[in-house]
UniProtKB/Swiss-Prot annotation:
HAMAP family per the UniProt record, alphabetical: CyoE_CtaB (MF_00154)
Organism: Brucella ovis (strain ATCC 25840 / 63/290 / NCTC 10512)
Membrane topology term: Multi-pass membrane protein
Keyword vocabulary terms for this entry: Cell inner membrane, Cell membrane, Heme biosynthesis, Membrane, Transferase, Transmembrane, Transmembrane helix
Full protein name: Protoheme IX farnesyltransferase
PROSITE patterns: UBIA (PS00943)
Lineage: Bacteria, Pseudomonadati, Pseudomonadota, Alphaproteobacteria, Hyphomicrobiales
């Protein structure tokens, strides 16, 4: 991919606002990352200093934003082609690519060093690896080279609860790995459902998403496969004892519903039915992840508050 050099300075940088820089951070993605990171931090055993907890979450947020900025820098050519991304700051001519690169690298270094110096270096190392994985492994390599880009690249979005857990405990445990696996297995059906009704956009940008390379039927079959894998993994926090019965019931019901929506997508026998089913699965996938992590957070906060008041 060709990169602009001196000509980048011709951009109208003076017109860039704080909102434009906020867009570079991908705030919607950042909010999900912060939420799952917070759940990992609160769910972890023990008590963490509130100030250090806030610093940890802020560092996770800044690191996630840095990843988004680096992604927009490298993918500026793709963003200019796709309808849903062509108004981003670089293709819109608001911020120069070299400015975005500097912004992303600065935020990356700041978030990692702050987390390491103020909290612990294990959490900082996980954050650094997450930024590297998303910006380099996924964005620069996998995204443009294989239809399995989402499967492997999904690891980047699955690390935040592990980072939160490591910030609170200084450890990587099986419990935190389960949180990682839930998001990791959730990612393929979520994004493949999206790609099924945005196929033309990905085709125009020459991104080898599963529907464009392997076809719609294969994509639908694999979405169902990952949904079936994910559903029982989603129940593991209860099975392993670091979530309560309420979570067990909610995660089971939501997991079964997820499999049902994925099955409806696989079984669709016409294009209109397939597109409708893909949209429903995509929307429900958001509800699923938000739902189970919200219950985890609710239970963890409830148990810790009760313990603080000596109830048990």
């Amino acid at each position: 991919m060709e990169k602009n050099t001196a000509s980048e300075d011709a951009f109208a940088l003076s017109e860039a606002t704080a909102r434009d820089y906020l867009v570079l951070l991908k705030p919607r993605v950042m909010s999900l990352v912060v939420f799952t990171g917070l759940v990992g931090l609160v769910l972890a055993p023990g008590h963490m200093n509130p100030v250090l907890a806030v610093i940890s979450i802020l560092c996770i947020a800044v690191g996630a934003g840095a990843s988004g900025a680096l992604n927009m820098w490298y993918d500026a050519d793709i963003d200019a082609v796709m309808k849903r991304t062509r108004k981003r700051p670089i293709p819109a001519g608001i911020i120069a690519p070299n400015q975005v690169l500097a912004f992303g690298l600065t935020l990356s270094a700041f978030s990692v060093m702050t987390l390491g110096l103020m909290v612990n270096w294990l959490a900082a190392a996980l954050l650094a690896f997450t930024i590297f994985f998303y910006a380099v492994i996924y964005t620069m390599w996998l995204k443009r080279s294989t239809p399995q880009n989402i499967v492997i690249g999904g690891a980047a979005g699955a690390f935040p609860p592990m980072i939160g857990w490591a910030a609170a405990t200084g450890e990587i445990t099986w419990d935190s790995l389960v949180l990682f696996m839930i998001i990791f297995l959730w990612t393929p059906p979520h994004f493949w459902a999206l790609s099924l009704f945005t196929t033309n956009d990905y085709e125009a940008a020459r991104i080898p998403m599963m529907p464009n390379v392997k076809g719609e039927l294969s994509t639908r079959r694999q979405a169902l496969f990952y949904a079936v894998l994910m559903a029982p993994v989603g129940v593991l926090p209860w099975v392993m004892g670091f979530a309560g019965m309420f979570y067990g019931v909610v995660s089971t019901l939501l997991g079964l519903a997820f499999v049902y929506y994925a099955w409806r997508l696989w079984a669709a026998d016409s294009q209109p039915q397939m597109l409708a089913a893909a949209r429903k699965l995509f929307r429900f996938s958001l509800l699923y992840l938000a739902g189970i992590f919200a219950v985890l957070l609710f239970e963890a906060l409830t148990f810790k508050l009760l313990a603080a008041f000596g109830v048990f």
